[in-house]
A protein has these predicted regions:
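Catalytic P-loop NTPase motifs of RecA-like helicase/translocase cores
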Residues: 47, 97, 120, 125-127
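Active-site-proximal loop->helix
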Residues: 47-56
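Active-site phosphate-binding strand-loop segment of PLP-dependent enzymes
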Residues: 61, 65-119
Length: 140
């Protein structure tokens, strides 16, 4: 509980603490996504994110790594086909294998455009990247 309170103070928002990073990635997707919802994710997203999506829904699409156009096309097509259910776009702030990052402002703008949610896994950039050390996703 103390760690959770300290993280909430540091970030200025509510936090949920998991025992491992893998459980966090898996658990947050499993908790947010219903069986009829959709997940659109970078095809090299961490295994915990992919497994969380598989556990949550059958409606999963993966776009080519960092391909914004393909991500937007999938988002547009999914929203046109299903105007009612939720769509979660999943990416990482810093991909650990190649040390590359998506254009998070574009992802945020595009998710809003199609009434979708954006989940950014900041496990590999939290604490040492970004203007405040809070990672590449803070603030976007």
């Amino acid at each position: 509980m103390q760690l959770q309170r300290e993280l909430e103070e540091y970030w200025g928002m509510h936090m949920l603490v998991f025992a491992t990073g893998w459980m966090g990635g898996f658990g947050v997707i499993r908790a947010l996504v219903r069986p009829w919802d959709h997940v659109i994710m970078d095809h090299v997203s961490h295994n915990c994110l992919q497994e969380g999506a598989i556990a949550a829904t059958r409606n999963i699409k993966k776009f080519e790594h960092l391909n914004q156009d393909e991500m937007e096309r999938m988002l547009r097509e999914t929203r046109e086909a299903d105007p009612d259910n939720a769509i979660l776009v999943v990416t990482e702030g810093l991909f650990s294998m190649d040390a590359d990052s998506p254009d998070l402002k574009f992802y945020q703008k595009t998710a809003k455009k199609y009434n979708a949610y954006l989940l950014i896994d900041c496990a590999h950039d939290f604490g040492h990247l970004g203007p405040t050390g809070k990672g590449t996703s803070f603030p976007i």
